Amino acid sequence: MHNRKGVKVLTLDDFDLDSKTVFLRMDMNCPIDPETGEILGTKRIEEAIVTLESLKDAKVVIASHQGRVGNNEYKGMNKHAEVLEKLMGREIKYVEDTIGESAQNAIKNLQKGEILLLDNLRLCAEENYEFTPENAAKTIMVSRLSKLFDICVLDSFPSAHRSHPSIVGFAQKLPSCAGRIVEREVRNLDEMMTVAKAPHVIILGGSKVPDRLEAIKLLIQNGRADHVLLTGLIGNVFMRAQARIKSPLGIKNEDEVVAKAHSLIGDYPDVFATPVDIAIDRDGERVEMDVREISKGDKIFDLGPKTVEYYSKLISGAGTVFISGPAGFFEKEDFKYGTSEMLNAVANSMATTIVSGGHLTTALKQQGLADKINHISTAGGALVLYLTGEKLPMIKSLEDAAEKHRAK
């Protein structure tokens, strides 16, 4: 496999995998119902199957994370094992450990053709921090586990923009290649970007604001964003930067984040579109209002109909549309409207379309719109950054691993 710059990356087809013990970094991070703790969408788990089938003669150890420390999606991986077992119709071994003695013994005892899923990688403190590849290789996680494996397969494209030990560390120590998901994503995205037409409309939502701000700037600078339509928490940040929301949003480093949004608006005043009306939750009921009517303490849960109409017109005139992140609290029935209507507008446009992120792919499936989209990716932030032309840490690790392999 070659990336868009012609650099060779090894794939599963470059290795003899028979009876090899494989470290398989997947991304099974799924949307979780905040009230029940149940998995809402299994798309990322389903996608893992094509790679697992290619590894049918190996001893496979799946490593993934779920949520972030401190949020309500931070869970163990036992339910993921149950879902995968049901999807594949076969036993999936599970160990409630990541790098300890139980995990190590489970890996050592694995037989040819068996699959083992480790617990949430972020239970290991090191996995919550970014490292250079060289330092990642020195972490306890990589030092302890790498000696148990023959090959590292990196297939967690949604996490490819992170420099975590499991993503960049093992490739320093082991022969490494891309899995089928990464192979497909890179090939399809590179093909699409060669034919993408202006105007480019980017619709951004969700809650991962700091990552988005830098990506927005790069997308604009690289000619990938003629219009940026803002929804979700990032939309609130930009409305706060415009002084259209008076009350603090209660997010980490809010002053710094809002200042960056304000700077972007100043540098690119004709690019950004923010909501004109919204919906809040008032005593358990959906209440729609003009943005100017927002009171202190009101929490924005969705877009209003005027914003949907405004954004839909911009989408209908686009040559290329990219949407990432829900427009609101779509898990709640009363606040699905904005996300649903944005996806309808994208699906019914004549543009080349890309839908990105675990939450949106779940919503897209629920609405039966998947067949109308050119490319669907469970990656969110990684895909946004890839479209800017920036080198993703995972891809760089795979390139370096390929160079080492060829040098032997």
Model regions and ranges:
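Active-site loop-to-helix "anion-binding N-cap" substructures in soluble metabolic enzymes
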Residues: 1-408
